[in-house]
A protein has these predicted regions:
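Alpha-helical subdomain
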Residues: 1-140
């Protein structure tokens, strides 16, 4: 119980602003760890970069207009996903996607009619859940 974490209990974890700076291997290991250490019904809220509009799924593509800006700021982009593959990506790691929207959609829904500046469509927030034993991670 050190630090408040109890393995095997229903947990909610917020993993915001982290995924894009990790390697694919680190993202994979973290998701698998989360699914193995927490009880069914546990949820993971996370953000990620949607690569669908950029023409490539690797972290080395030149098509990301802000990639160099991030690198110069000491925050190199390493990982993103195409939105269409997120459900299968999570299912392979023992999780089920329950919600996935762009930050622009999330903010517009939460603050209708307000000037929100220019939130992006490619920065997304998602909710994944450890399915109950009777369910499968693919959505049963």
């Amino acid at each position: 119980a050190r630090g408040g974490f109890l393995s095997g209990k229903v947990t909610v974890c917020v993993w915001e602003g982290v995924v894009s700076y990790l390697s694919e291997e680190a993202v994979d290991a973290t998701l698998r760890w989360f699914a193995s250490q927490n009880a069914p019904g546990s949820r993971l809220v996370f953000t990620y970069i949607d690569l669908s509009g950029f023409g490539s799924v690797s972290g080395a593509e030149e098509g990301l207009p802000w990639k160099n800006v991030l690198a110069k700021a000491g925050e190199p982009f390493r990982f993103g996903l195409e939105t269409a593959v997120v459900p299968a990506f999570l299912a392979e790691r023992g999780l089920r996607l329950t919600w996935d929207v762009s930050t622009a959609e999330a903010l517009a829904g939460r603050y209708p009619g307000r000037d929100l500046g220019s939130p992006t469509e490619f920065y997304r927030v998602a909710l994944a859940e450890i399915p109950a034993a009777a369910d499968d991670a693919a959505g049963g």
